[in-house]
Swiss-Prot record:
A molecular function (GO) term: structural constituent of ribosome
Residues forming coiled coils: none
Membrane-spanning residues: none
The name this protein goes by in its record: Small ribosomal subunit protein uS17
InterPro entries linked to this entry: NA-bd_OB-fold, Ribosomal_uS17, Ribosomal_uS17_bact/chlr, Ribosomal_uS17_CS
Subunit organization: Part of the 30S ribosomal subunit.
Keyword Membrane annotated: no
GO BP terms in the entry: translation
Length: 82
């Protein structure tokens, strides 16, 4: 069975070897017929502490690493410096 891969934005990197990633999904509301945005936060393993707040990353489902971490960061893009 293939592992799920999600794309999101890092919203916290304060924990050692862990990032919190916000994944957004969009759907059409069945009654209102308008696009609705919903997001969910996932704790993901970041072995090298490479990703910072604002970076776009892809996370992959993984075996449980801790109580909250079931995802690992597989790749990403650094946020552009201004």
């Amino acid at each position: 069975m293939p592992k799920r891969v999600l794309q999101g934005v890092v919203v916290s990197d304060k924990t050692d070897k862990t990032v919190v990633v916000r994944v957004e999904r969009r759907f059409t509301h069945p009654l209102l017929k308008k696009t609705v945005r919903r997001s969910k936060k996932y704790h993901a393993h970041d072995e090298a502490n490479a990703w910072k707040v604002g970076d776009t990353v892809w996370i992959e489902e993984h075996r449980p690493i801790s109580k909250l971490k079931n995802w690992i960061v597989i790749q990403g893009e650094k946020r552009a410096e201004v």
